[in-house]
Every structure is written in structure tokens, then in C-alpha cells.
Amino acid sequence: IAYDALAVVVHPSNKVSNLTREQLEGIFTGKIKNWKEVGGADMKIVAYSRETSSGTYEFFKESVLKNKNYMNGILSMPATGAIIQSVSQTKGAIGYVGLAYINKEVKPIHVSYDAGKTFTEPSFENAKNKAYPIVRPLFYYYDVKNEGKVKPFIDYILSAEGQATVKQVGYI
């Protein structure tokens, strides 16, 4: 019914603007521990993640970490808003959030999935045209016994009006 892009965000004072998928994997698995290892200041990296029960957690693990485990001691947050707040208040912080949650309190990172040849800004346009790599489809599952009750909603959400609502709430 829609697509969701995940943006990697850091504290606004962080000088790092670009990271490769491999560097992100290193950061979130604990192999890279200091920003100086990726071109930043000599500062400890503080990584934030969603809780293990979150679909966002699983998707980031599959897409970015290539199913490697998150580092021990990663700071798990119950909601995206908590990641935004924590990253905005912690100079060495990094986390990932849905594209719709980006605001001026955090700095989005440009990401490369081609070993650093091309870095792409997380934006609705880049996600929609598939230039930005961290994008997942969103599905609506229902029991077929309830199809009569659910079909009007599915028809609406797939209509032009429904898709406008999807975009308005931050999905693609």
C-alpha cells in the first residue's frame, strides 16, 4: 500500500555527511567505535536503534547490516520520536528513523550502497525514484474471511486520494 524510507541521522554538529553501507554496518555492529574512523571528530559513537520487536529494527538489520547482529549495548528506543530526541541531544549519536521524522534537530546522512561511488540524500523524491537505497514496502495483511469489511479501506488507500493521504503522513 506504500513504501517507507529509513534515514540515518546524526547530531547536527557532526561533520560526517556521507557513510557507506559497509561503514553503517561497522557502526551498528560495533566494529567502528569512533567518528574519526569514518572521517569525523575524535568522538565515541553512540548508536541508537529501535527495539527488537519493531519491524523497522528487522528491516534495518536485513538491509543495512546484511543480517549481522547489532552490537551489544546498542541503545534501544521504544519509538522513533525517542531516537530523534536522543540523537538531537547527544553529540556522538547516530540512529535511524522513518523519512517523515527528519527535522532540523537532527542531520540526515547521505548513504552509499556502491562502496562510496555515489552518496544519496534521504528524500521522498530519491526514495520514490529508487535512487535512495534504504526503502521497504509496506503491506496490509488481513484475514480473507474479513475481505468484505476490509475491501473498502484497501480500495480507498490504493486510490489517488488514499495515496495522497499516504504521502501526507510521510510514506511514499
Which residues are covered by each model-predicted region?
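Exported/periplasmic ABC-transporter solute-binding proteins
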Residues: 1-172
